[in-house]
């Protein structure tokens, strides 16, 4: 599947948490212990002064053992199956629709559209979902860095 990068509409914003999503910060750990509930109470309130963002390419910006979360709304211009790609290093997840409406620490990784969990070098996690034109859908993506570089890119394409 080829997914082309597009600019996202305003209304997306970023939140930074001073904690890694997984208690295991060793090498290429598995995603078994990736746990969004670890983020509760670790929101960095003094950090997010960027306001809304219009594209997601957060590579080389995540501090080691931090987690960044992109939140907002996605409004497709065409009905049909949309492809999403999350490029992440390390643990990363992307949710669309009602699965994305929870607070970050209440998200369920088992219903993520894109699942790039665990410790690993930059890699892609792909997913597709049927969306209706003109409807607003919640979108949330989370990437944590355990060290050794980072990547956080969201790409998408419509039908």
Regions from the PLM with identified roles:
Residues 6-159:
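Acidic/polar, compositionally biased interaction segments
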């Amino acid at each position: 599947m080829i997914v082309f990068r597009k600019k996202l509409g305003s209304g997306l914003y970023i939140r930074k948490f001073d904690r890694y999503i997984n208690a295991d910060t060793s090498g290429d750990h598995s995603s078994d212990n990736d746990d969004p509930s670890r983020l509760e109470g670790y929101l960095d309130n003094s950090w997010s002064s960027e306001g809304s963002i219009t594209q997601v390419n957060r590579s080389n910006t995540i501090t080691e053992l931090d987690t960044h979360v992109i939140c907002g709304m996605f409004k497709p211009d065409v009905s049909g199956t949309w492809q999403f790609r999350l490029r992440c290093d390390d643990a990363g997840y992307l949710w669309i629709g009602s699965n994305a409406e929870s607070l970050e620490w209440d998200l369920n990784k088992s219903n993520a559209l894109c699942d790039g969990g665990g410790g690993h070098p930059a890699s892609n996690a792909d997913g597709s979902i049927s969306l209706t034109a003109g409807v607003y859908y919640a979108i949330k993506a989370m990437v944590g860095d355990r060290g050794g570089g980072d990547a956080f890119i969201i790409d998408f394409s419509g039908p």
